[in-house]
């Protein structure tokens, strides 16, 4: 039995604990403080740290956590630079096994060159690649890379639960509404998430099958999305990759 525990950090980050009995893994600990507080409150032993990419708000707590738990294993992306840490660096197709839980590593370049995601047991820990209602900015990769990465994640089973690293859902959905104002799934999702946030509750995890209905970055082949992107770009777009590139540029200034 595995339980995922939400640990809010900074302004809008989420750090995830995967718990099994009195042991746990932590995903993208940008800040050690709230993680250590939660581990102490629940009397949990930290067995391993999983990193999706090298940005500071995802790795900033690693040193302090390893100081408190020196036997914890560190895992991270092979193709993202982590010069300050020694760990096991993972590539596409690698696998982590922990207390019967198998997590497959998926290389998802776009946000960074080496970004990876972890998938298994119906869970997807995807860092800053796929957000609920949106996707990450392109700091290092190309639009074509990010589109391909999102397509790989979108091919996972419908009931996959998405544990991304930021609470961006409402702003993502407002952009989605600008792209597809007649999409009832977007309208309904805005209402649902607004209520959750008013109660101080996270919008995550999100179900992948639902994301396909309202996340415009997963809907680039839809005529309604293509039409809006062409209207914004003032030109015809030949394929879903071109549509994605326009959407990502549009979202950057939305």
Curated annotation (Swiss-Prot):
Q: What is its EC number?
A: 3.1.2.6
Q: Does the keyword RNA-binding apply?
A: no
Residues that coordinate or bind Zn(2+) 1? 53, 55, 111, 128
Single GO biological process annotation from the record:
methylglyoxal catabolic process to D-lactate via S-lactoyl-glutathione
Q: How is the cofactor bound?
A: Binds 2 Zn(2+) ions per subunit.
Superkingdom of the organism of origin: Bacteria
Enumerate the residues binding Zn(2+) 2. Answer: 57-58, 128, 166
Q: Which UniProt keywords apply?
A: Hydrolase, Metal-binding, Zinc
GO molecular function (one)? metal ion binding
Name its co-factor(s): Zn(2+)
Describe the reaction catalysed, as an equation.
an S-(2-hydroxyacyl)glutathione + H2O = a 2-hydroxy carboxylate + glutathione + H(+)
One Pfam match, given by its short name, reads: HAGH_C
Pathway(s) of this molecule:
Secondary metabolite metabolism; methylglyoxal degradation; (R)-lactate from methylglyoxal: step 2/2
Q: Which SMART domains match?
A: Lactamase_B
Give the matching InterPro entries: Clx_II_MBL, Glyoxalase_II_hydrolase, HAGH_C, Hydroxyacylglutathione_Hdrlase, Metallo-B-lactamas, RibonucZ/Hydroxyglut_hydro
Question: Subunit arrangement?
Answer: Monomer.
Task of the protein: Thiolesterase that catalyzes the hydrolysis of S-D-lactoyl-glutathione to form glutathione and D-lactic acid.
Tell me its family: Belongs to the metallo-beta-lactamase superfamily. Glyoxalase II family.
What the entry lists under HAMAP family is as follows: Glyoxalase_2
Protein name as annotated? Hydroxyacylglutathione hydrolase
> Which source organism does the UniProt entry give?
Aeromonas salmonicida (strain A449)
């Amino acid at each position: 039995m595995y339980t995922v525990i939400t640990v809010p950090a900074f302004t809008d980050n989420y750090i995830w604990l995967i718990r099994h009995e009195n042991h746990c893994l932590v995903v993208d600990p940008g800040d050690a403080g709230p993680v250590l507080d939660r581990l102490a409150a629940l009397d949990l032993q930290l067995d391993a740290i999983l990193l999706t990419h090298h940005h500071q708000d995802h790795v900033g707590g690693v040193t302090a956590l390893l100081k408190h738990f020196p036997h914890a294993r560190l895992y991270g992306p092979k193709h993202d630079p982590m010069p300050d840490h020694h760990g096991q660096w993972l590539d596409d197709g690698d696998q982590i096994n922990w207390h019967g839980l198998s997590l497959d590593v998926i290389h998802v370049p776009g946000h960074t060159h080496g970004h990876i995601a972890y998938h298994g047991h119906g869970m997807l820990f995807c860092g800053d690649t796929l957000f609920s209602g949106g996707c990450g900015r392109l700091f290092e990769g190309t639009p074509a890379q990010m589109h391909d990465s999102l397509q790989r994640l979108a091919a996972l089973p419908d009931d996959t639960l998405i544990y991304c690293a930021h609470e961006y859902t409402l702003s993502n959905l407002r952009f989605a509404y600008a792209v597809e104002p007649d999409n009832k799934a977007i309208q309904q999702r805005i209402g649902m998430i607004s209520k959750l946030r008013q109660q101080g509750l996270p919008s995550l995890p999100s179900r992948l099958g639902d994301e396909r209905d309202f996340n415009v970055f997963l809907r680039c082949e839809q005529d309604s999305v293509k039409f809006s992107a062409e209207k914004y770009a003032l030109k015809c777009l030949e394929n879903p990759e071109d549509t994605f590139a326009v959407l990502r540029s549009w979202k950057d200034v939305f």
